Regions:
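ER/Golgi luminal nucleotide-sugar-dependent glycosyltransferases, focusing on the catalytic module
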Residues: 1-156
Length: 156
């Protein structure tokens, strides 16, 4: 761990904006309202960000970011993780280096995050932690895994 850096247990290039889908035609008005809202809050794919399920950072840096934020909803939490004003973007704008580490102790820069095998790639065999999203991926068949991998990283 270095000054002006953050180490995370997993990351993603995924975007809530790009992954938003109209599932039922009769919900089209709600879909467009949500799309309009998401365009204000989230960048399209690729949207590199650390997953906030596990990361290491100096408390003072974290508190500096959180000083004007409140989390009242799941959407607020999503904005902190992957929004235009996310923790990752705040840290990048302040010159931080952002890494993912895996269970082998290997460190990966942003352009190599996928290769850490910690989230939605391969069998995630090198994850340090487990959460519902990691467990869900493990339950998928190969075709479903390919879709998740594509939505997360843009490639299989």
């Amino acid at each position: 761990y270095e000054n002006n850096s953050v180490v995370a247990t997993s990351a993603s290039y995924g975007s809530l904006l790009t992954s938003l889908k109209l599932k039922k035609f009769y919900k089209i008005i709600g879909y467009y309202l949500k799309l309009f809202n998401y365009k204000k809050k989230f960048n399209p794919f690729p949207n590199p960000h650390i997953r906030t399920t596990g990361f290491l950072i100096k408390a003072s840096d974290y508190l500096s970011y959180m000083s004007d934020k409140t989390i009242k909803s799941k959407e607020d939490a999503w904005c902190i993780e992957s929004g235009k004003k996310s923790l990752t973007n705040f840290l990048k704008n302040h010159g931080f280096k952002i890494f993912v580490v895996n269970s082998n102790g290997d460190k990966f820069a942003e352009d190599k995050w996928k290769l850490s095998e910690t989230f939605n790639y391969s069998n995630q065999e090198k994850s340090i932690i487990s959460d519902k999203h990691i467990r869900k991926y493990l339950e998928l068949n190969n075709n479903e895994r390919k879709k998740f991998t594509f939505n997360t990283w843009g490639v299989y």
